[in-house]
């Protein structure tokens, strides 16, 4: 028996899946639907979603289209990059980090419109259902969550198309459809499905939409300088940029040089392994630059502890725990380390690679007087003998005990 819901806020893209969901909610739940379309830099026009929603009977006052690009980068991407977060050593969490923001805004719109439910288009097999719903529940557990993919029998594209045709849902024809399931925002674009379901099959070159094939990238390297303050990139080649403009600009520069591709088999939170290909050009540069500026501004033990915490932090984001107290606790600790992460990093971009070639900071802990290979007057090398002996004391004691 279906729960009674009067008004539902749907995360709506205007595409086939969410347009079918919109109509299905109206028919199955007999409820009023509010559509929410987030512009987080996915590269598609979001206004057509308004026309599609109107055509499906949504009242103009129940259509929300919000530009969240600056908030997305400033309050979600940048904090994540302060942690140098990478899931399972390769994934820069481009999809994972976008879902909490969308979920949060859905709940806010539910409160604005007096809605008593929220809905999303994530399937029952993937991680996104968890990410959306953990966000909903953390912000307002009284809202009814409707996940159509866990309820209906429209479990194929053919069935969705048939439903759309039967109910007069206009689906734009864009020529040959990509064989991949794709998701994009300012941080990345992802590809799943198709031949990628064979982990041994190499995808065709035409799949990659954001980055030049590294072999075809410019034959001349490009040098850029990123300025950092409190761990965040704030300027490019001396020009101050907003967070969203910074990431957008780095995407274009890095993409031209074939930087940021990844082909990964990852462990989903729901238990299965999944293969995905990702392009994260600007994020790849930001991560490299951030680690470089940290290398001269963080204390050794501070940096090492931060690296130990990073996998746990990344796992929390991947699994949908952005709003959890443990993620917020880790974030507070991470942000404390960033107060002196200020300076500039020079990077060399060339045919798919990004290399740090310079770094400087007024808070640099790198002191040439101590680390020089030439003669110095500040470091007595004889002191190293006692340091080594004390550190090896437990080995010495254990060795003597074993000889008894």
UniProtKB/Swiss-Prot annotation:
One of its GO terms (cellular component) is cytoplasm. Its main location: cytoplasm. One of its GO terms (biological process) is argininosuccinate metabolic process. ATP binds at residues 11-19, 38, 121. Its EC number is 6.3.4.5. L-aspartate binds at residues 123, 127-128. It is found in: Cytoplasm. It catalyses: L-citrulline + L-aspartate + ATP = 2-(N(omega)-L-arginino)succinate + AMP + diphosphate + H(+). It is an enzyme of class 6 (ligase). GO terms for molecular function: argininosuccinate synthase activity; ATP binding. L-citrulline binds at residues 91, 96, 127, 131, 181, 190, 266, 278. Keywords: Amino-acid biosynthesis, Arginine biosynthesis, ATP-binding, Cytoplasm, Ligase, Nucleotide-binding. Coiled coil: none annotated. Pathway: Amino-acid biosynthesis; L-arginine biosynthesis; L-arginine from L-ornithine and carbamoyl phosphate: step 2/3. Homotetramer. NCBIfam families: argG, PRK00509.1. Belongs to the argininosuccinate synthase family. Type 1 subfamily. HAMAP family: Arg_succ_synth_type1. This is Argininosuccinate synthase. It comes from Sulfurimonas denitrificans (strain ATCC 33889 / DSM 1251).
